[in-house]
C-alpha cells in the first residue's frame, strides 16, 4: 500500500493487519538518544500507539504485537525496543554487579529461551553509578548460566555478535532492570553506512533532527534540502528515506531482530508487516525516481566524502535517485557558486539548510568553529537576500555559544547526543539580510551644525561623490574624509555600517580645549551626515598625547601599521615564581583569568569586501585589521592566485591570504612575527569557509628575514607589505623600509618561481625604490593602479610595485 503524497511517511492506522494477536497488548520501553524524546513521541502518535514519557530517553509504550513490529520496522528515531523481564531497587553504595546477579537469579530463564539458543548481555549504566560494565554483564551471564545448569544440567552458549536471545540491562541510581531486547541491536544501524567520514552523525539522530524541523510533515513542506558540509551524507540519506517511505528496519528483517525466538512471536504476522513495508517503499521509490523529489544538494570539501555519499546511497537502495541529486566536492567558500544555478532555476523556493559542521570533533580547531558558523550564516543571508522565502536553518554545535552567531529568527535549541558527544541543534528561519551599507543608503540633505558647517558640507560632498563610485565597484569599506580641512585633522573611514574616526594629534600651537571642541563638533557632524547613533562610531588617535587629551586606547598606539610586526614586549618574570607553589598557582590562575576577560572584551565586527568577509576591531588596536588602502592590491592578488603557490610576508591578519585562497590558490603561506595576528587571520579564513587545518594553508609565526633565508620553497605570487619601521632581530635591532627593502626583496626573489610576481607595497610617504633593483629585476610601479578611488592619487597613501625575474 502506498502512502498519499500529502500524508506522513510513518505508518498509520489504515495499515493495520487483522490478526488474532491484535487484541493482546504489551507494556514495553522504547528508548532514544537524549533530546529526541519529542520526535519519537511524534512518531508513536502517528502510529496511533499509546505512550508516555517516563524519563530522559525512555518512552513507556502500550502496544499490540503488530505495533511492536511496526516500531521495529518504521521508527526512524528509536534506539531500542525493550520488553521488561525483571526489575528491582538497588543501593549504589553496595556492590552493584552482585545486585544485578541477584536480580538475574530471580528469573527462570528456561521459560524465556531454549538451551540451544544463544544469548548475549548488553547494558547501559548511569554515569553516576560506579560499576564495571563488563564485570556487571559477566555477573548477569553467570546467573543465567547457573539457572540452566541447575534445571537442565547444561549451559547455553554466548554469541556476542548475533544472539538468538539478546538481553539488555539498565542501571540508574535507584533501580536495575533486565529486558528482552526486541530490536536485537540498536535501531540506528540502518545497514547503509558502508563508507564513513570523521565524526559521523548517527542515523537516528539525523532523522530526529529532520523531524524537529518538519521535513517529515508533508512531501511538499520543503522544495529543497541543502547540506553544505554533508560528510558521508547522513542527513541527505535520511531525508530521502523519509520521502520514499522507506522502512528503516527492513535490512534487519532477515536475522537481526531480538523477537524471533520470543515465545510470543507471530512469524506470519511479521511477514505480513514486512511485505507491506516493502510494497510501500517500492511505490515511494518509483514516484521519487519519476521526478517527484525535492531538490537535494550535498557539498563537501573532501572528495572522499562525496564518494562515501554515493556508496551509502547505493547501500540504502537509492541508486535510482542518484542522477536526480546534486553531490559535489565544493568547500564552503564556494557555496555561492554552488547555489547560483539552482536559484536561477527557481528550485530553492522553500529550502531547508541542515548540516553537521566540523564542530570541533571533525575540525580539531575549536577556536575557529564560531567564525565558521558565522561565515556560513552571512553567506546564506547573501545568497537568499533577494528570495521571497528565507530558508529554514538547522546546525549542530558542540557548544551552544558557537551557534549564537547564527542569524536565526526566534532560534530554538535542542540538546542531544551524537553517540557519547553532547551536541546542540540550533534551528529556525534565517533572518533576511539587512539593508544597504552606510555609504549606499546615504542621501544628501540639509544639515545645520553650528560652528562646523564647513566640515559638514565637505563631508556630505565627499560622500555624495563616493557613493556612485562605491556602488559601481560594490565597495562598502572606504575612506570618506582625509584631513581635507586644516581645522578638522581627522581621517574618516566607513566599514559597512560603522564609522571609524582617527584623530591626528593637533600641533602644540593649538590649545587642547580648541582641539577637543573641534573634534566633538566633527563627531556631531558625522552622526548627522550618516544618521547613525553613538554606538556606530569608533574613535582613535594616531599619536600618544599627554594627560586627558588621549582619545584613543593608549595601549593600542603601538599597534599601528608602522609597528604592526614589532615583537611583543617581554614580560617581567622576575617575581613570577616567588613564594610557594600554591601562590604560584594562584598568580597563574589570575593571569589566565585576566587574559580571558581581556579577550572577552575585544569586540569583533564583520565587514565584507569583494565577496570575502573579515573581522575588524575598532576598539583594541589603533588599526582595525583591514587596511582599506590596499583594497585594489588584494583584488590583484586574488586574480593572480588561481592555481598558484602564494606567499604573504608581514601577513598581519591575513586578509590578502584570504583573497588568494578564495581566488583558487594552490597553497597559501602567511608569515608574520605576531601569533596573535595570525590567529586573527585563521579566524578570517574560517569566516570564509576555508579549512584552517588543511596543509594548503600555512600560518607561520617567525621573523621574516630568518624565515625567507631558511625556507627553500618556491612561490608563484609573493606579497610583501612591510611596516615603515619596526623593531626586529635583524638589521641593528630595527627594520627601516627605506634602508632595508633591497635586502628584503633580494631574499624574497630567491623564493620566487620563474614566471612569478612579487607585489611589494609600503606606506612610507617618501619611499624611493633602490635603483639597483630596477637593474637586477623587471620592476613596474603600480601605485596608480592600487590607490583606490577614495584616496588622493596626488598624495599616495602607499607605494606599490610589481617585481619579476628578468627573462
From Swiss-Prot:
Record keywords: Cytoplasm, Methyltransferase, RNA-binding, rRNA processing, S-adenosyl-L-methionine, Transferase
Residues annotated as domain THUMP: 67-182
Catalytic reaction annotation: guanosine(2445) in 23S rRNA + S-adenosyl-L-methionine = N(2)-methylguanosine(2445) in 23S rRNA + S-adenosyl-L-homocysteine + H(+); guanosine(2069) in 23S rRNA + S-adenosyl-L-methionine = N(2)-methylguanosine(2069) in 23S rRNA + S-adenosyl-L-homocysteine + H(+)
Localisation per UniProt entry: Cytoplasm
Region (Disordered): 548-602
Compositionally biased region (Polar residues): 548-560
Matching PROSITE patterns: THUMP, UPF0020
GO molecular function: 23S rRNA (guanine(2445)-N(2))-methyltransferase activity; RNA binding; rRNA (guanine-N7-)-methyltransferase activity
Domain of life, source organism: Bacteria
Biased composition (Basic and acidic residues): 561-575, 584-594
InterPro entries: 23SrRNA_methyltr_KL (IPR017244), DNA_methylase_N6_adenine_CS (IPR002052), RlmKL-like_Mtase (IPR000241), RlmKL-like_Mtase_CS (IPR053943), RlmL_1st (IPR054170), SAM-dep_methyl-trfase (IPR019614), SAM-dependent_MTases_sf (IPR029063), THUMP_dom (IPR004114)
GO annotations of cellular component type: cytoplasm
Similarity section: Belongs to the methyltransferase superfamily. RlmKL family.
PANTHER family cross-referenced by the UniProt entry: RIBOSOMAL RNA LARGE SUBUNIT METHYLTRANSFERASE K/L (PTHR47313), RIBOSOMAL RNA LARGE SUBUNIT METHYLTRANSFERASE K_L (PTHR47313:SF1)
HAMAP family documented for this protein: 23SrRNA_methyltr_KL
Classification via NCBIfam families: PRK11783.1
The protein, known as: Ribosomal RNA large subunit methyltransferase K/L
UniProt source species: Psychrobacter sp. (strain PRwf-1)
Amino acid at each position: 500500500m502506498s502512502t498519499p503524497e500529502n500524508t506522513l511517511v510513518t505508518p498509520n492506522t489504515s495499515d493495520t493487519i487483522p490478526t488474532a494477536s491484535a487484541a493482546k497488548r504489551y507494556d514495553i520501553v522504547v528508548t532514544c538518544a537524549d533530546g529526541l524524546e519529542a520526535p519519537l513521541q511524534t512518531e508513536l502518535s502517528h502510529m496511533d500507539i499509546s505512550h508516555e514519557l517516563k524519563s530522559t530517553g525512555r518512552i513507556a509504550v502500550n502496544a499490540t504485537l503488530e505495533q511492536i513490529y511496526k516500531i521495529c520496522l518504521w521508527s526512524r528515531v528509536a534506539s531500542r525496543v525493550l520488553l521488561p523481564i525483571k526489575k528491582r531497587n538497588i543501593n549504589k553504595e553496595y556492590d552493584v554487579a552482585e545486585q544485578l546477579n541477584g536480580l538475574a537469579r530471580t528469573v527462570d530463564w528456561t521459560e524465556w529461551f531454549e538451551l540451544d539458543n544463544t544469548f548475549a548481555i548488553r547494558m547501559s549504566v548511569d554515569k553516576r553509578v560506579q560499576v564495571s560494565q563488563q564485570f556487571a554483564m559477566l555477573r548477569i551471564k553467570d546467573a543465567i548460566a547457573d539457572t540452566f545448569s541447575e534445571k537442565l544440567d547444561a549451559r547455553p552458549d554466548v554469541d556476542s555478535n548475533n544472539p538468538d536471545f539478546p538481553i539488555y540491562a539498565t542501571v540508574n541510581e535507584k533501580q536495575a532492570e533486565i529486558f528482552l531486547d526486541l530490536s536485537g541491536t540498536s535501531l540506528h544501524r540502518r545497514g547503509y553506512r558502508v563508507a564513513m567520514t570523521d565524526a559521523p552523525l548517527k542515523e537516528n539522530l539525523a532523522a530526529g533532527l529532520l523531524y524537529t524541523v518538519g521535513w517529515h510533515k508533508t512531501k511538499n513542506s520543503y522544495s529543497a534540502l541543502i547540506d553544505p558540509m554533508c560528510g558521508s551524507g547522513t542527513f541527505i540519506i535520511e531525508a530521502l528515506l523519509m520521502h520514499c517511505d522507506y522502512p528503516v528496519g527492513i535490512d534487519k528483517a532477515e536475522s537481526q531482530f531480538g523477537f524471533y525466538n520470543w515465545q510470543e512471536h507471530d512469524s506470519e504476522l511479521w511477514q505480513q508487516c514486512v511485505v507491506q513495508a516493502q510494497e510501500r517503499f517500492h511505490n515511494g521509490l518509483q514516484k521519487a525516481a519519476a521526478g517527484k523529489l525535492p531538490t537535494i544538494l550535498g557539498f563537501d570539501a573532501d572528495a572522499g566524502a562525496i564518494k562515501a555519499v554515493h556508496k551509502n546511497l547505493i547501500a540504502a537502495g537509492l541508486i535510482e535517485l542518484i542522477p536526480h541529486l546534486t553531490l559535489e566536492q565544493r568547500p564552503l567558500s564556494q557555496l555561492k557558486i554552488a547555489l547560483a544555478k539552482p536559484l536561477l532555476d527557481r528550485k530553492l523556493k522553500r529550502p531547508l539548510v541542515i548540516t553537521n559542521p566540523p564542530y570541533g570533533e571533525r575540525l580539531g580547531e575549536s577556536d575557529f568553529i564560531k567564525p565558521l558558523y558565522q561565515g556560513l550564516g552571512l553567506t546564506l543571508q547573501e545568497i537568499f537576500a533577494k528570495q521571497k522565502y528565507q530558508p529554514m536553518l538547522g546546525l549542530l554545535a558542540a557548544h551552544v555559544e558557537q551557534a549564537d552567531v547564527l542569524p536565526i529568527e526566534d532560534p530554538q535549541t535542542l540538546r542531544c547526543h551524537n553517540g557519547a558527544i553532547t551536541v546542540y541543534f540550533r534551528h529556525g528561519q534565517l533572518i533576511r539580510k539587512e539593508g544597504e551599507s552606510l555609504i549606499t543608503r546615504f542621501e544628501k540633505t540639509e544639515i545645520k551644525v553650528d560652528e562646523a558647517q564647513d566640515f559638514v558640507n565637505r563631508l556630505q560632498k565627499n560622500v555624495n561623490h563616493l557613493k556612485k563610485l562605491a556602488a559601481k565597484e560594490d565597495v562598502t569599506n572606504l575612506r570618506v574624509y582625509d584631513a581635507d580641512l586644516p581645522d578638522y585633522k581627522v581621517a574618516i573611514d566607513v566599514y559597512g555600517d560603522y564609522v571609524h574616526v582617527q584623530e591626528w594629534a593637533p600641533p602644540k600651537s593649538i590649545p587642547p580645549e580648541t582641539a577637543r571642541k573641534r573634534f566633538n563638533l566633527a563627531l556631531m557632524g558625522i552622526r548627522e551626515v550618516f544618521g547613525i547613533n553613538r554606538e556606530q562610531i569608533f574613535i582613535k588617535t594616531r599619536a600618544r598625547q599627554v594627560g586627558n587629551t588621549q582619545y584613543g586606547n593608549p595601549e593600542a598606539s603601538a599597534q599601528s601599521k608602522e609597528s604592526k610586526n614589532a615583537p611583543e614586549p617581554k614580560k617581567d618574570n622576575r617575581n613570577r615564581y616567588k613564594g610557594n607553589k600554591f601562590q604560584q598557582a594562584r598568580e597563574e590562575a589570575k593571569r589566565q583569568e585576566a587574559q580571558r576577560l581581556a579577550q572577552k572584551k575585544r569586540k569583533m565586527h564583520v565587514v565584507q569586501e569583494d565577496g570575502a568577509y573579515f573581522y575588524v576591531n575598532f576598539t583594541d588596536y589603533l588599526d582595525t585589521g583591514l587596511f582599506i588602502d590596499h583594497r585594489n592590491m588584494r583584488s590583484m592578488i586574488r586574480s593572480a592566485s588561481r592555481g598558484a603557490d602564494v606567499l604573504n610576508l608581514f601577513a598581519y591578519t591575513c586578509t590578502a591570504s584570504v583573497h588568494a585562497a578564495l581566488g583558487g590558490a594552490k597553497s597559501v603561506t602567511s608569515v608574520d612575527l605576531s601569533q596573535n595576528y595570525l590567529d586573527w587571520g585563521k579566524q578570517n579564513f574560517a569566516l570564509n569557509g576555508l579549512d584552517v587545518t588543511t596543509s594548503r594553508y600555512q600560518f607561520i609565526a617567525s621573523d621574516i628575514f630568518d624565515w625567507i633565508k631558511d625556507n627553500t620553497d618556491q612561490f608563484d605570487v609573493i606579497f610583501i607589505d612591510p611596516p615603515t619601521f619596526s623593531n626586529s632581530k635583524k638589521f641593528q635591532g630595527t627594520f627601516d623600509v627605506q634602508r632595508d627593502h633591497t635586502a628584503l626583496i633580494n631574499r624574497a626573489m630567491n623564493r620566487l618561481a620563474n614566471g612569478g610576481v612579487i607585489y611589494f607595497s609600503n606606506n612610507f610617504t617618501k619611499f624611493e625604490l633602490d635603483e639597483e633593483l630596477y637593474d637586477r629585476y623587471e620592476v613596474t610601479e603600480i601605485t596608480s593602479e592600487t590607490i583606490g578611488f577614495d584616496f588622493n592619487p596626488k598624495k599616495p597613501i602607499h607605494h606599490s610595485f610589481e617585481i619579476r625575474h628578468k627573462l
